[in-house]
Curated annotation (Swiss-Prot):
Active site: Y123
Organism lineage: Eukaryota, Discoba, Euglenozoa, Kinetoplastea, Metakinetoplastina
Keywords associated with the record: Deoxyribonucleotide synthesis, Iron, Metal-binding, Oxidoreductase
Name assigned to this protein: Ribonucleoside-diphosphate reductase small chain
Gene: RNR2
Function: Provides the precursors necessary for DNA synthesis. Catalyzes the biosynthesis of deoxyribonucleotides from the corresponding ribonucleotides.
Originating species: Trypanosoma brucei brucei
Catalyzed chemical reaction(s): a 2'-deoxyribonucleoside 5'-diphosphate + [thioredoxin]-disulfide + H2O = a ribonucleoside 5'-diphosphate + [thioredoxin]-dithiol
Amino acid sequence: MPPKSHKCSRKEGEVEEPLLTENPDRYVIFPIKYPDIWQKYKEAESSIWTVEEIDLGNDMTDWEKLDDGERHFIKHVLAFFAASDGIVLENLAERFMCEVQVPEVRCFYGFQIAMENIHSETYSVLIDTYVVDPDEKQRLLHAIRTIPCIEKKAKWAIEWIGSQTSFPTRLVAFAAVEGIFFSGSFCAIFWLKKRGLMPGLTFSNELISRDEGLHTDFACLLYEKYIVNKLPRDRVLEIICNAVSIEREFICDALPVRLIGMNSQLMTQYIEFVADRLLVSLGYDRHYNSKNPFDFMDMISLQGKTNFFEKKVGEYQKAGVMSSERSSKVFSLDADF
């Protein structure tokens, strides 16, 4: 008799979530019952990369040209990222993988865990490469305990791992973590790319932001199409607006983006735009009605009208894996809401 899976409690009167319904066939993949979910897994599988494929050879020349404020900003962005992927990974391993009973979803989550490891390793390598002083290096690598503004973001995400709230609530919360908490930092690093700086850092950012876009897109697919007990709009707004407030405080006030020559007001507008995009993808109306103020973000690998998986940015897609018909539903930056 196989062991029972971890069950997620539900409120009285709620219908059991199909994704969480006990499934004795959860150990076997075929036959595929959720082709759109399986498609997302194949998209993720086709895009695997490793840290060894990132060339940091020219970055140190640019690093030395940056002023102290620019270096401070980049170091603290990397410090947040170095731990954040581990937080997402722990939630997947401890909660979502135990709760969800659909093999296709588990395949995606299993692959996402592998990619979060690669992301975390990449950020650790970047810190190890750029930061020479060993004490500062350790402070940055342990930023969720040593740097208050990073600790605040991490604490918000970690609390959701142990939360007794419903699966749909936590699904929205971690969509906010990956869709909003990373947005300002991704945007700031793409700003450096626009300036022609740090090619290794900016290319790794392109790959990681593409992956995180897919992860967020996947969470939205599960929620919008398969979650039965959807949250009231007010509850979703509470989660999303809280995440926006924390991200705005982090990227605009604590670091802040003016250190690299970016406008804080425009960055706030961009974060609100990203939040609206997330709300729409979850099936709700926009809240902020903010426009994307950064034209250079229209072409990044979170993707606009050209699907990354068609474009093959940097040729990081395994040949043949995505040769079948591809899904056109993409978590896009430039959708007309």
